[in-house]
Amino acid sequence: MDILSLGWAALMTMFTFSLALTVWARNGF
């Protein structure tokens, strides 16, 4: 795996986690 695909995967993971956390916080609090 090269650095570009690794960085892209990390970016998508961070974005998905951030979005899920925002939705969870909004519904939870």
Curated annotation (Swiss-Prot):
One of its GO terms (biological process) is cytochrome complex assembly. GO terms for cellular component: chloroplast thylakoid membrane; cytochrome b6f complex. The chain crosses the membrane at residues 3-23. It is a single-pass membrane protein. GO terms for molecular function: electron transporter, transferring electrons within cytochrome b6/f complex of photosystem II activity. It is found in: Plastid, Chloroplast thylakoid membrane. SUPFAM superfamilies: PetN subunit of the cytochrome b6f complex. It comes from the Eukaryota. It holds the Pfam family PetN. Keywords: Chloroplast, Electron transport, Membrane, Photosynthesis, Plastid, Thylakoid, Transmembrane, Transmembrane helix, Transport. The 4 large subunits of the cytochrome b6-f complex are cytochrome b6, subunit IV (17 kDa polypeptide, PetD), cytochrome f and the Rieske protein, while the 4 small subunits are PetG, PetL, PetM and PetN. The complex functions as a dimer. Component of the cytochrome b6-f complex, which mediates electron transfer between photosystem II (PSII) and photosystem I (PSI), cyclic electron flow around PSI, and state transitions. Belongs to the PetN family. This is Cytochrome b6-f complex subunit 8.
